[in-house]
Amino acid sequence: MGKASNGRQGRRKGVARAVKQALAGSAALYAASVSAQTQAPAAITVLPTVTVTSAPVALGEAPAPIAGGLIGGGARMGILGNTSVMDTPFSVTSYTAQTIENEQARSVADVATMDPSVRMSSARSNINEDLTIRGFNVPTADFAFNGMFGLTPYWRAPVETLERVEIIKGPSAALFGMTPGGSVGGVVNLVPKRATDEPITRVTGSVMSDSVFGVHADVGRRFGPDNAFGIRVNGMLRDGDTPIKDQSTREALGSVALDYRGEKLRSSLDLIWQKERIDNVVRQFQLGADLTSIPEAPSNKNPYPGLGWSDGRNTAGVFKIEYDITDYLTAYAGYGQRKLDWDAFAANPVLQNTQGDYSFFGGWQRMTVDSKSTEAGLRSNFKTGPVSHKVAFSYTLLDQKSDLGFYTGFPPGNSNIYAGNIFDTPSISGISNPLNRYQSTKLTSYALADTLGFMDDRLQLTLGARRQNVQGQNYNFANGEPSGPRYDKSATTPLAGVVFKVRPDLSVYASYVEGLSQGDTAPTSAAITNPGETLSPFKSKQKELGVKYNLNDDMLATVALFELTRPSSGISGNTFGEFGEQRNRGVEASFAGEVAKGVRLLGGVSYIDAVINKATTPGLQGNKAIGVPDWQFNLGAEWDTPFVPGLTVLGRVIYTDRTYANADNTLSVPSWTRVDAGARYETKISGTPVTFRFNVENLFNRNYWGTATAGYLFVGTPRTYTFSTSIAF
C-alpha cells in the first residue's frame, strides 16, 4: 500500500530530472535574502480638503512592505479597504511573498503558524489543514481570497500564487461578513500576485525529504501605455515520497492573473487551478470513551491509520473592478466562482487506551462544492468642517451548495500507535456511491462604516454595522431529501474602533467587534419544550485594547489585550437555547523587523486563559477549554553574515504549552517545543541572480502530539529537509 505505480514512478522521474537540472551546479546549500518586490500604486486624485492618513493603494495591490520586508505595512480590512497597520484598531499581520519564499512554505498553514497566536489544528499530511487563531478553529474553507469568501481552495491553500497572507485576529463579521463555516477566531485573507513594473521571470527547482521534487515558474510582465496592463503567470508541480512512511504526494497548480490600472478604472481577473493527491493520507485521532490518559506520542514518521487516499481538484475565477466616479467617490464590484471535486478513502482512528491501541472504520467519500461570491460597494472621502470622513458601503452575497457521497460498509481494523502498520486500502470496485445534495447556504449582507478623523487624523474613530441574513438547508445525503427545517435568520453586528496617534510612530487603539455563526436547531424530542426551534445566529463578541510602535518602518512591535466570547447551545430546564459560552481572555506581544544591521526578528508570545464560562452540563463550568494552550511562543531570527557576503543563516523556536483534550479536563497533552534551522545564499552566476535555500523543520526530530479545539489529536511533523535553487532571468 502507498507504493507508486509504474506510471506515477515515470512521472516522478520526469519531475526529478527537471529539478535536478535546475539544481545542477549548485554546491552551496545556502541562500541570500531576496528584496520584496513592490508595485507602484495607480495615481488617484484626492480633493485638497480631504486629509489622507496613508498613501492610496490601487485595486489588487498590497501595501508596501516594512520591517525589513518581513511583513506588510497594512492589510485589506474588509469594508474599510486597504488600511495602514498604524491606522487599524485591530491586531493584524501581513506576511510578504519574501517571507513566504525564504521560509520555503508549502501552504498557508506554514505561513500563518509564524504568528504566536496561531497554530495548526490538523496534521500537515492530513486531508485538510486548519488553523486555531486566538483559541478558536478557522478552517481553510473559511479563508478569504482578496477579501471575498468561498473562493479559496477548500482543503489546503498553496502559496505560490500569493503576494501576501494577511491575518486579522478576532471575529470580523462587520468588516468582511459572516464566514461560510461561521468561524470567529480571525480572518485569513489571501492576496494574489500582480505583475510589477519590473519584469519577473523566475524558475525554482526544489527537493524535499524523503524524495519530493518540485518545479515552480513565476512570470510577470506589464505592457501598454503607462504599463497599464499586467499579466502574472504561476505554475507549480511537486511529486514524490514524503517523510511519512509509505506516503506519496502529487501537487499541481496553475494561475493566471490579469490586471488593468488606468487613471480612473482598475480591474483584475484571477484564474486558478489546483490538484492534489495524497496516498496513505494521515488522519487525526479521536478519543475513546475508556481512555484514562494520553499515551506518549508515537513516531512522527508513521501514517495513522496507514491506508487510504485523498484526491482533490479546485478551479476558481475571480473578477474585480473599481471606478473613480469623482475625485472623492469610488464604486467597486467583484464576482467569483469556485468548484471543488474531491474523492477520498479515509479512516479516523479511535485511541482506546494508554497502551496506544486504536480501532478504525474506513469510509469512501466523494464531495463537490460549488460557490458563487459577489461583492459591490462605494467608498468616499470628504470633510465636514475640521472632521475628515472615510465612508464605505458594502454588499456581499455568497451562495454555496455541496453534494456528498459517503459509503462506510467496510470491515473495521485495529492496530497500535507504536506498531507502525501499513494496511491495504479496501477495494471500491463495483460499489455504488452516488452524489446527493448535502448542504446549501446563502449569506447576504449590507454594511455601512465611517472612519472619522480629528486633530489632523491623529484621532480616528471608526463606527459601522452589518446586517447579515443567513439561509441554510441540510439534506440527507443518502437520498438528497431535506433534513430538518430550513434556516432563515438575520442579525446585525456592530463595529467600533478608535485609534490615537501619540506620535506618528506610536498608536494606541481600542475596538469592539462581533462574529456570527449559524444557530442550532432544537432536537425533536418530547422532553424538549421547544422541539425543532431554530436559534438566531450566535454572536461572538470581542473587546480589544492595544499599542503599536513602528520604528522608521524598520521594526513593528504590537501589544494587544483581548477578550473573546463565543456562545453555544444546550438544554436547560427542558428548553433548548443559547446557554453555553467559551471565554478566551488573553494578551499578545509580537514584533517584526531589523533590530540591528543584518539581524531580523519575527515572533512573539501569547497568553490565553480559555475557560468554559457558561455550561449546562454539571461540572464543566469553569473548566479549561479543549485544545487551547495557556502559552504560545515563536521566535524566528535571520543573520546576514559579514564573513560571507550574500549568506544568511536563520533559525526558529516554537513553543506550545500543555492543553486539555477533553471537556472534563481529565486528559491532557504535554507541551512541545520545535526548533527549525536553515540558511540561504544569494549570488550571480554568469550575471544571472541565483538564490539557494536550505531549511530544516523539526531539527531535533521531536515526537509530539498536537491538539485541535474539537478534541482530536494528531502527530507533529517529522524532521523535514527542503533545498531549492531559484534563478531570476
Show which residues each predicted segment covers.
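Structural signature of Gram-negative outer-membrane beta-barrels, strongest in the C-terminal barrel
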Residues: 259, 369, 388-400, 437-566, ...
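Outer-membrane beta-barrel translocator/receptor signature
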Residues: 160-163, 174-255, 260-266, 315, ...
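Acidic, small-polar-rich N-terminal luminal/periplasmic segments of exported/outer-membrane proteins
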Residues: 28, 47-198, 545
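Conserved C-terminal beta-signal and adjacent last beta-strands/turns
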Residues: 391, 510, 543, 626-729
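Gram-negative outer-membrane beta-barrel transporters
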Residues: 560-565, 578-663
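Outer-membrane beta-barrel proteins
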Residues: 206-213, 228, 236-261, 294-318, ...
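Face-selective signature of the C-terminal outer-membrane beta-barrel domain
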Residues: 318-340, 361-477
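Acidic/polar loop-and-plug regions of large Gram-negative outer-membrane beta-barrel proteins
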Residues: 238-242, 257-324, 337-369, 408-443
